[in-house]
Amino acid sequence: MALTLDDHLEAVANVYRREMLLALTDHNPQFDRAALTYGSNQPLEDRQVALEMEHVHLPKLVDMGLIRWNRGEHEVKKGPEFEKIEPLLAVLPGRRNSLVDDQSP
């Protein structure tokens, strides 16, 4: 699948997807097992984020070929198309901040 500029922008439009992609530019980490734990001892917001990651954001990045995701091992690695989005990730304002929150000149 050839990714378009619109695809790249969609991939980084959400803060959770953007943070995942930025983390992969620094190294090829494993996704934290605790992040996908839905136990009642976790704050509701954390459980909601984990559910969103599992059911929305990670599948979207997989479909784009940007990541490889082993659900059983809760492991995320760079996908076959990852190198194509790296130039965009490199120029994001503040690198880890919201695009609209960055106040740099």
Language-model segments: which ranges?
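Short alpha-helical segments that sit at the start of domains
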Residues: 1-27, 32
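Short acidic, hydrophobic short linear motifs in intrinsically disordered regions
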Residues: 30-46
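Residues in the recognition helix of alpha-helical DNA-binding motifs
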Residues: 57, 79
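A short, conserved structural fragment
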Residues: 58, 62-72
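Short, Lys/Arg-rich nucleic-acid/phosphate-binding segment
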Residues: 71-76, 82
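Short, amphipathic alpha-helical interaction segments positioned at domain boundaries
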Residues: 83-105
